[in-house]
């Protein structure tokens, strides 16, 4: 958890970073601009994943930026400043969804891959020097094909898995923010959690959470299968999707997502908890907490406060014809925290065009940094990047940019956020994409990294 500094200029772009707080891609050293994930380092450097230019199958790489935003060309050992993520599958389309720093100084990179007819998730583990750790998986790489999730021998699933937990992706319109959908998280003892969805023989979609050992092998001590299916007991739901995951210090795992009711006229979001053995934890308010009647809702992120184990969940929902950022706080036991918005979910519409929360970071004083994309969730001229600081009770912090939030808005393009994190000194780092109108549909014209003062 980050200790905030709350300076007088909090929420304004940091002029010491790149060009007055904004680094635009491509840059002379890097042809690509599709930024994907970001991680800050203790020495104030930044790891950034992006896809290079060149079309289908172009390399996916990790770059390391110095504190001032310049490329660290010593990274990777070949003078390029880049490390290519190789999964042993030529011409596969890859992305990077998460970068983790391991307790031994090494690194774990998680993403998705696709090469017809196969697709799935991958994990690549590196030593501290960014050489492959060949003790992990097969020579440093573990592939988890979607078709293998939920082995049909055990749970009667047909093995068919969806490639995205975002049902809106089928509309054909470009999403304004990159839905990470399947997520991964590493536990303190090295266990790795993956979430996604599977389809039953009856056609019902259900979320799934899998646990791997630190060497990449399946952990069969988790629910005796290596995975657990999200059932949402007591809810007559049609489908449920996983969108977020978080692990407590005691090894219990929280999974969040959305569901549609059986009558097709409603739904909402859920947070459910499994114990360290993969069983539904009924001490968590019966096992599952829901926010119902949140039409068109998503639960994009879950964070846990170290101090008291309380849980912050954020996403979005439709309210009065516009998308609203949605956030709620639960106690460690799964009850709504009365200290936040009087124990009710907080729906925020800070700009007229609506908004979504995609990421949040918890501060030591109880404040919450939240960031997302404005608009209706798709790449239109309404898409900008909004970042806010909320006080522990859910109200906006007026010391952050003078009104509690700030909007990143380039003149010629419209913007979407991909990822957000925070440096140890509280400065906020975000990466995302620039979009432009084309003859057929909005297209990606560039990428960016920005840094805000704390």
Model-derived regions: residue spans:
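Extracytoplasmic mature domains of secreted or surface-exposed proteins
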Residues: 1-454
């Amino acid at each position: 958890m980050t200790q905030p500094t709350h300076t007088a200029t909090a929420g304004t772009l940091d002029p010491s970073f790149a060009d007055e707080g904004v680094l635009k891609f491509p840059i002379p050293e890097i042809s690509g601009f599709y930024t994907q994930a970001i991680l800050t380092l203790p020495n104030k450097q930044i790891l950034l994943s992006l896809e290079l230019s060149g079309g289908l199958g172009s390399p996916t790489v990790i770059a390391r930026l110095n504190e001032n935003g310049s490329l660290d060309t010593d990274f990777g050992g070949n003078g390029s400043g880049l490390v290519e993520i190789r999964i042993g599958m030529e011409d596969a389309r890859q992305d990077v969804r998460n970068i983790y720093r391991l307790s031994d100084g090494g690194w774990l990179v998680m993403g998705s891959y696709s090469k017809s007819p196969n697709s799935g998730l991958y994990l690549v583990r590196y030593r501290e020097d960014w050489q492959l750790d060949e003790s992990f998986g097969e020579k440093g790489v573990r592939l988890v094909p979607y078709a293998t999730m939920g082995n049909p021998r055990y749970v009667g699933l047909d093995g068919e898995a969806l490639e995205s937990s975002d049902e809106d992706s089928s509309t054909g319109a470009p999403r304004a923010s990159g839905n990470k959908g399947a997520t991964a998280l590493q536990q303190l003892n090295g266990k790795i959690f993956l979430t996604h969805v599977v389809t039953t023989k009856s056609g019902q979609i259900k979320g799934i959470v899998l646990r791997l050992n630190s060497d990449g092998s399946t952990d069969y001590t988790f629910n005796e299968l290596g995975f657990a299916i999200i059932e949402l007991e007591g809810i007559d739901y049609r489908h449920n999707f996983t969108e977020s995951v978080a692990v407590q210090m005691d090894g219990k795992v929280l999974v969040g997502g959305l569901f549609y009711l059986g009558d097709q006229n409603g739904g909402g979001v859920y947070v459910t908890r499994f114990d360290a053995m993969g069983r539904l934890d009924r001490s968590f308010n019966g096992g599952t907490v829901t926010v119902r009647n949140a039409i068109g809702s998503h639960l994009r992120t879950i964070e846990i406060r170290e101090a008291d184990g309380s849980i912050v969940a954020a996403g979005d929902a439709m309210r009065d014809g516009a998308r609203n950022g949605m956030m709620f706080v639960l106690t460690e036991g799964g009850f709504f925290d009365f200290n936040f918005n009087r124990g009710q979910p907080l729906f925020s519409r800070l700009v007229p065009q609506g908004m979504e929360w995609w990421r949040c970071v918890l501060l030591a004083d109880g404040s919450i940094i939240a960031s997302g994309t404005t608009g209706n969730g798709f790449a239109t001229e309404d898409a900008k990047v909004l970042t806010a600081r909320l006080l522990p009770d859910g109200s906006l912090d007026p010391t952050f940019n003078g009104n509690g939030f700030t909007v990143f808005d380039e003149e010629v393009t419209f913007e979407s956020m991909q990822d957000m994190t925070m440096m140890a000194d509280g400065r906020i780092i975000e990466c995302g994409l620039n979009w432009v109108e084309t003859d057929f549909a909005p297209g990606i014209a560039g990428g960016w990294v920005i840094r805000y003062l704390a």
